[in-house]
């Protein structure tokens, strides 16, 4: 058993903003702290279900968020087990993930969660990931 989080839909419904409405497009950003908190709560629920069931419930994230190298670090730091993305995104995501420990990913995730806006959350995470600039990301 596993839990799969579709970040595109999660973001749309968490922010109550239709992706097709231009005036609300700025809200459809998976870096929104509210969306990150929903992911964290989902992971926590899956861990609780794992204890109750006596077997691990894996949490997977699919959608554009998993393909963002900086956000992938945050997702892993939040406890996400697997990331589903298009093949073209794998090299950059893998390079960035290999550059941090799990403890560092958790620290970066917490920094993002502390922010008020999506822009601040993204900036806080990127500030902790100098490899992004080194790789031109």
Report each predicted region and the residues it spans:
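Non-catalytic helical/linker scaffolds that mediate oligomerization, partner binding
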Residues: 1-137
């Amino acid at each position: 058993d596993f839990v799969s989080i579709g970040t595109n839909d999660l973001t749309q419904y968490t922010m109550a903003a239709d992706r097709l409405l231009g005036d609300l497009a700025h809200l459809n950003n998976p870096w929104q702290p509210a969306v990150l908190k929903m992911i964290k709560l989902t992971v926590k629920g899956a861990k609780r279900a794992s204890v109750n069931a006596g077997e691990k419930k894996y949490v997977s994230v699919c959608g554009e968020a998993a393909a963002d190298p900086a956000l992938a670090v945050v997702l892993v730091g939040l406890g996400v087990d697997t990331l589903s993305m298009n093949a073209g995104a794998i090299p950059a995501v893998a390079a960035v993930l290999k550059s941090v420990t799990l403890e560092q990913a958790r620290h970066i995730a917490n920094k993002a969660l502390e922010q008020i806006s999506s822009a601040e959350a993204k900036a806080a995470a990127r500030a902790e990931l100098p490899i992004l600039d080194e790789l031109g990301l």
